[in-house]
C-alpha cells in the first residue's frame, strides 16, 4: 500500500508538467493568432492599393447581366475639412459617352483608403440639377434628406472596414449613359480632415454594351489586364 501511495505521488508532478505544457501551448496559440491577425491586416492594407481581380470589386461581387459591360471611373477627393463636403459629377469617357441612349443598370461605388486614412466619411450618389453647385454647403444637406442610400465608412483599429462598397440601382429610373453627368458622387468628412491622398473612390457603371466593346469585360478571363478605354 505504501508503494502504491508512493507511486500515486510520483504521478502528480507528471500531471503538473502536462498542465505546464498545455499552458505553454495555449500561450503559443494566442501569440500565433495575434501574429496571424497582424499579418492579415498588413496584407489587407497592401492589397487595397494593388491592382487585382478584386480591384475594383465590381467583378468580384457580381457578373454583368447579359448584353452589358461596365465603365470604371476613379475619383480622388480633394482635401476636405471636418464637417465639410466634396462633390464631383460623373464624367463618362469616350467612346462610351458617344452612345448616350445606352441603358445603365447600376452604379457601384467602392472605397479604397490609403494606410493613412483614420477618420469617418459618408458617401452617396445623387442626381442633381445641372445648376446645382457642388459646394460644401449645398452638398451636406443631401446626406440628411433621406432620398438616397448613404455608405458610412470609418477607420477601425483592426484594419480596413470590410463594408466598403455600395450599389445604386439605376434600372428603376430608366437611367442612360447620357444621364450620368447629372449624377454626382458626394463625400462628407465627419470627424476629421480628409487629406487628398487618403482615399480613392472607384465607380463602376454597368451599362449596355457599345460597338467598340464587343466583349464584356465582366466575362473576360483576363480581367486584371483590361484597362478602361
Curated annotation (Swiss-Prot):
GO terms of molecular function: RNA binding; structural molecule activity
Keyword Disulfide bond assigned: yes
Pfam families: Cucumo_coat
N-acetylmethionine carried by residues: 1
Top-level taxon of origin: Viruses
Subcellular location, record wording: Virion
Disulfide bridges in this chain: 64-106
Main localisation: virion
Region (Disordered): 1-28
GO cellular component term of the entry, any: ribonucleoprotein complex
Biased composition (Gly residues): 1-10
InterPro entries the UniProt entry points to: Cucumovirus_coat, Cucumovirus_coat_Asu_sf
Keyword set, alphabetical order: Acetylation, Capsid protein, Disulfide bond, Ribonucleoprotein, RNA-binding, T=3 icosahedral capsid protein, Viral nucleoprotein, Virion
Function per UniProt: Capsid protein. Probably binds RNA and plays a role in packaging.
Domains as described in the record: The N-terminal arginine-rich stretch does not seem to be the major RNA-binding region that allows formation of an infectious ribonucleoprotein complex.
Recorded family membership: Belongs to the cucumovirus capsid protein family.
Protein name per the record: Capsid protein
Amino acid at each position: 500500500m505504501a508503494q502504491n501511495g508512493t507511486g500515486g505521488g510520483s504521478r502528480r508532478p507528471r500531471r503538473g508538467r502536462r498542465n505546464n505544457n498545455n499552458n505553454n501551448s495555449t500561450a503559443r496559440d494566442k501569440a500565433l493568432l495575434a501574429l496571424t491577425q497582424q499579418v492579415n491586416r498588413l496584407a489587407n492594407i497592401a492589397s487595397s492599393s494593388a491592382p487585382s481581380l478584386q480591384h475594383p470589386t465590381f467583378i468580384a461581387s457580381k457578373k454583368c447581366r447579359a448584353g452589358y459591360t461596365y465603365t470604371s471611373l476613379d475619383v480622388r477627393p480633394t482635401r476636405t475639412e471636418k464637417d465639410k463636403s466634396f462633390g464631383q459629377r460623373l464624367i463618362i469617357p469616350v467612346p462610351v459617352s458617344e452612345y448616350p441612349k445606352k441603358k445603365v443598370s447600376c452604379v457601384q461605388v467602392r472605397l479604397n483608403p490609403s494606410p493613412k486614412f483614420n477618420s469617418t466619411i459618408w458617401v452617396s450618389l445623387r442626381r442633381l440639377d445641372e445648376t446645382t453647385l457642388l459646394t460644401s454647403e449645398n452638398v451636406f444637406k443631401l446626406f440628411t434628406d433621406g432620398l438616397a442610400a448613404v455608405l458610412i465608412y470609418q477607420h477601425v483599429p483592426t484594419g480596413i472596414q470590410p463594408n466598403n462598397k455600395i450599389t445604386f440601382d439605376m434600372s428603376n429610373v430608366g437611367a442612360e449613359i447620357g444621364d450620368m453627368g447629372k449624377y454626382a458622387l458626394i463625400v462628407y468628412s465627419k470627424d476629421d480632415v480628409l487629406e487628398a491622398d487618403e482615399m480613392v473612390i472607384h465607380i463602376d457603371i454597368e451599362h449596355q454594351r457599345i460597338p467598340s466593346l464587343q466583349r464584356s469585360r465582366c466575362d473576360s478571363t483576363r480581367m486584371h489586364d483590361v484597362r478602361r478605354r
